[in-house]
């Protein structure tokens, strides 16, 4: 759903074969496969079930992708959860679940794909953080901490893997119209749009098109960067 689904479709439109993971809704995943196939009839699209907070499931998904496609040119990590809660009300479970999906899952996926990318001396790793990973968000401390961790991972991994022909970049979306905003009222959204210099909210497709650009060979001299797709709300 959201940025993930939009990204699969944009990569399909750009001519890529795509394997992606789903966790809770197989019907939605299969619908994305059908849409991708319609955009790129000659492409191959595979939906794999995985909870990204489980390293064994992530490893299995990567191995299945390699078996079906032979090699992996790019990895994009955008699975995420969000939760609004006072810091003093956070439970251990809240904290560990947030880190498990939003940060541990990124680590597991990068670790799983890197051996193959290193062998082939080429790879694009694309991570999704958030503007809250850059600025911090009140009542979203655990989410902000996880997304800040993604930014730190991006910068450090880019330095380590650059000599192997692998770039690592991160997109930090601003306020994007996705399911995560379901609890926001129309008034809330209008206020957020007013705070944004371009005076509107972003779309998943705008984030997805940025990721497709970073995956391309034309972005080979860009690495370790955090690109804000945020309408100017963070400058």
Model regions and ranges:
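Alpha-helical segment proximal to the catalytic Tyr-Lys
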Residues: 115, 159-160, 220
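Residue(s) in the substrate-gating loop at a strand-loop-helix junction
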Residues: 130
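Active-site helix of classical SDR
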Residues: 110, 146, 154
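Short, small/polar-rich loop/turn modules that mediate ligand/substrate recognition or access, typified
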Residues: 70, 162, 167, 222-224
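Conserved glycine-rich Rossmann-like NAD(P)H-binding loop of the short-chain dehydrogenase/reductase
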Residues: 16-31
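Substrate-binding pocket helix/loop in short-chain dehydrogenase/reductase
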Residues: 86-87, 94-96, 181, 188, ...
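Canonical Rossmann dinucleotide-binding motif of NAD(H)/NADP(H)-dependent dehydrogenases/reductases
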Residues: 1-19
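Catalytic Tyr-X3-Lys loop
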Residues: 73, 81, 88-108, 122, ...
């Amino acid at each position: 759903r959201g940025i993930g689904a939009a990204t699969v479709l944009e990569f399909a439109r750009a001519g890529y074969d795509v394997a992606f993971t789903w966790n809770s809704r197989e019907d939605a995943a299969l619908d994305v496969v059908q849409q991708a196939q319609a955009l790129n009839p000659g492409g191959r699209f595979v939906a794999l079930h995985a909870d990204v907070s489980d390293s064994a499931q992530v490893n299995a998904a990567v191995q299945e992708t390699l078996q079906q496609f032979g090699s992996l040119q790019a990895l994009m990590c955008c699975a995420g959860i969000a939760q609004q809660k006072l810091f003093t009300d956070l439970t251990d479970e809240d904290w560990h679940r947030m880190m498990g999906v939003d940060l541990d899952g990124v680590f597991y996926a990068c670790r799983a794909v890197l051996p193959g990318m290193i062998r082939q001396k080429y790879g694009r790793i694309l991570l999704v953080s958030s503007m809250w990973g850059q600025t911090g968000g009140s009542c979203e401390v655990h989410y902000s901490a996880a997304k800040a961790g993604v930014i730190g991972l991006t910068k450090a991994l880019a330095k380590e893997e650059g000599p192997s022909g692998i770039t690592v970049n991160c997109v930090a979306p601003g306020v994007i119209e996705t399911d995560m905003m379901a609890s926001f009222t129309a008034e809330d959204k209008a206020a957020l749009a007013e705070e944004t210099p371009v005076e509107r909210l972003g779309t998943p497709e705008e984030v997805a098109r940025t990721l497709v650009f970073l995956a391309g060979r034309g972005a080979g001299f860009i690495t370790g960067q955090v690109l804000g797709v945020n309408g100017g709300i963070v400058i």
